[in-house]
């Protein structure tokens, strides 16, 4: 794979050629694909124009296929044909990944022969020839596209680091990326200043914090690459009694946070599973079979233990790099940066003055980072810092105007009322205050895994039954899983022990003590899932069993309609907080279109649906349009 720098060294042979090239530069298409969470992003003159994940269009959760639909969308939104795009950049380098596969097999042979044989055919037929594959796929968008030289490849962790730094509100930062694995790197440290990101240090495969966490995700019966957040949500129900066992046997953590994993206990480098029999023996029982076995206190204690190990490593890494480089700002990306509990602990420790986390921290965000790395790092274009950040609230996906929405609603036979802005906000806030569950579909769809008030299901956080009802009757998901609060930015410190912006729901904090209820001695003795039904605060629907909450601060300048809804709800209830969960059911991607939203509305126990200026009441809909929606999607 040709690296970013390789092509531009040739351009720089003649300075005049380089500068003319720079002036003509306008648009870059970034692509991530073929592992999980395929996505496309486009920037024009360095400005982020659009970004979306392929899963939202295909309705396949974590879709890894070539992001045809996402590319079509971002091109249309940028008003560009593919042949008019100046550069196309893939988020990682396939040749280096193949090198890792070969070297890993050689290092562990003959162990791992089975998985090696399984991986080889697809590498030899497709992945090794990624440029050819991409070129053929790209031509499907525009038959006039014929310049293979436009296709380039970034480094996986540079893509992550660039996605974290360039949209951030900082002109200088330490950038920490951590995930499963890119080409070779699993954790990187970069120093970013002005328009440059310089990777200084790396931890290489098979030593990976992301893969360690995924191994425990697998062991507790959840799906790797999608169930890690469930493991994090399960942790507060347990006690970290296995932490010392993990640190003694599985991972050697140094004082500076660097680490090495003991490969005797893992299969991910050589096998078709994450853990092995020796791992099972260490914890005295085999991996949980998700569909056949209940979660027990053991699994909750395991979750608590690996969560605490992860937090300890992240805190040690952050402390050591702050001490070494003395820079006050931290940017985070990579799948591990979606661990909002660990992020909250970093903020709480005040190691850095400010922390900014890329909302699409996983591989989807790599498409954006690859494009930004090319524009700034390689083409040396200047960077203008936005004090709010450049992600535009992460509202970078498709949107539908009222004309388009009404056309779709008429076609499907929906009953609806059209309301003006004021009436729409008032009626929705009133419904929420009366305990109703509302599907909320407004403006551009979010880029990244979190619903942030554009494609959300909303509820009243004061309700003791809201969490249970949303989990079981609307989302069809496990009862232990917590819900997140959206809160007016100006009121956040009144309700939570935090006074920082958290627009992307990537920081966990505790509920303000003034809003908490004390537990009785009897309640304190409860274990595991029995902790769930205790009312702990004035907002029980968003208060986890450890009095924590994953917070989204809502800002008028990024989502005015959602901000106004929260203000109206506060006016009615004296509470500036709403339950906010993604508009989907378990196993389904977040809804993208009005049709997706209506289908989810009719297939669940949602009471109301608000799409644009259209207000829909479940009771007034044709009951023949209902379906058994819980069977539409494979459970994740």
What are these regions (language model features)?
Residues 1-8:
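Short, small-residue-biased leader/transition segments that mark boundaries at the very start
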Residues 12-21:
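Short, positively charged and aromatic/hydrophobic N-terminal segments
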Residues 20, 34-53, 58-61, 104-115, ...:
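Flexible beta->alpha loop and helix N-cap segments adjacent to enzyme active/binding sites
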Residues 28-98:
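N-terminal cofactor/phosphate-binding cores enriched in small/glycine residues
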Residues 72-86, 138-145, 318-326:
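Phosphate/pyrophosphate-binding loops at sites that engage ATP/ADP/AMP, CoA/4′-phosphopantetheine
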Residues 82-93, 151-152, 326-334, 439:
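Short glycine-rich phosphate-binding loop at a beta-alpha junction
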Residues 96-100, 127, 131:
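Phosphate- and other anionic-substrate recognition elements at nucleic-acid/protein interfaces
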Residues 304-330:
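Phosphate/ATP-binding catalytic cores across multiple sugar-kinase/actin-like superfamilies
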């Amino acid at each position: 794979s040709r690296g970013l720098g390789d092509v531009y060294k040739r351009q720089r042979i003649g300075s005049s050629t380089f500068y003319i090239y720079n002036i003509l530069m306008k648009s870059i298409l970034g692509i991530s694909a073929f592992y999980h969470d395929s996505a496309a992003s486009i920037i024009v003159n360095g400005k982020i124009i659009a970004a979306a994940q392929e899963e939202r269009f295909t309705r396949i959760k974590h879709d890894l296929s070539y992001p045809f639909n996402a590319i079509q969308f971002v091109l249309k939104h940028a008003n560009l044909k593919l042949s008019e795009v100046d550069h196309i950049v893939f988020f990682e380098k396939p040749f280096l990944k193949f090198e890792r596969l070969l070297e890993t097999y050689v290092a562990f042979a003959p162990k791992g022969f089975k998985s090696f044989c399984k991986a080889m055919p697809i590498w030899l037929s497709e992945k090794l020839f990624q440029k050819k594959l991409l070129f053929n796929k790209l031509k499907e968008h525009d038959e006039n596209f014929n310049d293979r030289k436009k296709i380039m490849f970034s480094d996986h962790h540079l893509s992550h680091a660039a996605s974290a730094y360039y949209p951030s509100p900082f002109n200088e930062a330490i950038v920490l990326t951590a995930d499963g694995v890119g080409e070779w790197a699993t954790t990187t440290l970069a120093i970013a200043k002005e328009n440059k990101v310089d990777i200084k240090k790396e931890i290489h495969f098979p030593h990976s914090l992301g893969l360690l966490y995924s191994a425990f995700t697998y062991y507790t019966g959840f799906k790797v690459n999608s169930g890690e957040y469930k493991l994090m949500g399960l942790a507060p129900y347990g006690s970290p009694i296995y932490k010392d066992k993990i640190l003694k046997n599985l991972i050697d953590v140094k004082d500076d946070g660097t680490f090495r994993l003991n490969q005797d206990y893992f299969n991910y480098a050589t096998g078709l599973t994450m853990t092995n029999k020796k791992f099972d023996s260490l914890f005295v029982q085999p991996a949980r079979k998700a569909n056949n076995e209940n979660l027990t206190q053991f699994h909750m204690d395991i979750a608590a233990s690996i969560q605490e190990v992860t937090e300890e490593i992240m805190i040690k890494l952050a402390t050591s790099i702050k001490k070494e480089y003395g820079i006050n700002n931290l940017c985070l990306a990579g799948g591990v940066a979606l661990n909002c509990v660990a992020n909250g602990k970093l903020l709480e420790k005040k190691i850095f003055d400010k922390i900014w986390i890329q909302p699409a921290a996983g591989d989807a965000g790599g498409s954006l980072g690859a494009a930004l790395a090319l524009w700034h790092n390689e083409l040396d274009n200047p960077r203008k810092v936005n004090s709010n950040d450049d992600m535009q609230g992460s509202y970078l996906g498709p949107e539908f105007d009222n004309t388009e929405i009404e056309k779709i609603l008429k076609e499907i036979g929906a009953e609806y009322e059209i309301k003006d802005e004021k009436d729409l906000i008032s009626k929705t806030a009133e419904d929420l205050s009366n305990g109703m569950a509302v599907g909320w579909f407004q403006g551009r769809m979010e880029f990244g895994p979190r619903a942030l008030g554009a494609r959300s299901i909303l509820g009243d956080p004061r309700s003791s039954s809201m969490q249970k009802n949303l989990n079981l009757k609307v989302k069809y998901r496990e009862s232990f899983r917590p819900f997140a609060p959206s809160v007016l930015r100006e009121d956040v410190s009144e309700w939570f022990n935090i006074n920082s912006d958290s627009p992307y729901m990537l920081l966990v904090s505790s509920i303000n003590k003034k809003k908490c209820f004390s537990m009785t001695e009897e309640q304190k003795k409860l274990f595991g899932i029995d902790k769930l039904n205790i009312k702990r605060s004035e907002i029980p629907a968003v208060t986890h069993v450890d009095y924590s909450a994953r917070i989204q601060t809502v800002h008028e300048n990024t989502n005015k309609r959602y901000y106004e809804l929260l203000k109206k709800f506060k006016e009615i209830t004296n509470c500036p907080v709403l339950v906010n969960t993604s508009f989907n059911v378990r196993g389904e991607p977040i809804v993208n279109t009005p049709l997706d939203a209506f289908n989810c509305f009719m297939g669940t126990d949602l009471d109301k649906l608000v799409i644009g200026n259209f207000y829909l009441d479940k009771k007034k809909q044709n009951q023949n349009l209902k379906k058994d929606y819980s069977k539409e999607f494979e459970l994740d």
